[in-house]
């Protein structure tokens, strides 16, 4: 029997983990970069990927001077590229099996 551990972070913990202010997190949420559960910032809970995504978003915003809309698009495209690379790798492995036959 396997058990699944679900990690959720509140606003304070996310701010500490990502080293950002609550105002910054609110902006990131407003632009759909991270999506918490809960209606208000006091009730928000974030998944375990939120600190990493938040750090990447802030880095793009600061270092490349992108607006938050641009950050959201860049992160979406980076995720799509990673997904396509994974799919390509899997397909290459499958193709390799057919070629060896």
Swiss-Prot record:
Q: Which InterPro entries match?
A: CbpM
Highest taxon, organism lineage: Bacteria
Instruction: State the coiled-coil residue ranges.
Output: none
Q: Which HAMAP family does the UniProt record give?
A: CbpM
Q: Relate the protein's function as given in its record.
A: Interacts with CbpA and inhibits both the DnaJ-like co-chaperone activity and the DNA binding activity of CbpA. Together with CbpA, modulates the activity of the DnaK chaperone system. Does not inhibit the co-chaperone activity of DnaJ.
The Swiss-Prot or TrEMBL record describes its family as follows: Belongs to the CbpM family.
Q: What is this protein called?
A: Chaperone modulatory protein CbpM
């Amino acid at each position: 029997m396997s058990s699944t551990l679900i990690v959720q972070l509140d606003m304070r913990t996310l701010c500490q983990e990502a080293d950002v202010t609550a105002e910054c997190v609110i902006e990131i949420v407003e632009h759909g970069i991270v999506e918490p559960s809960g209606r208000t910032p006091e009730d928000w809970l974030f998944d375990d990927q939120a600190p990493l995504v938040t750090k990447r978003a802030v880095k793009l915003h600061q270092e490349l001077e992108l607006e938050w809309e641009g950050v959201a698009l860049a992160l979406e495209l980076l995720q799509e590229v990673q997904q396509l690379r994974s799919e390509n790798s899997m397909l290459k492995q499958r193709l390799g099996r057919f070629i060896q036959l």
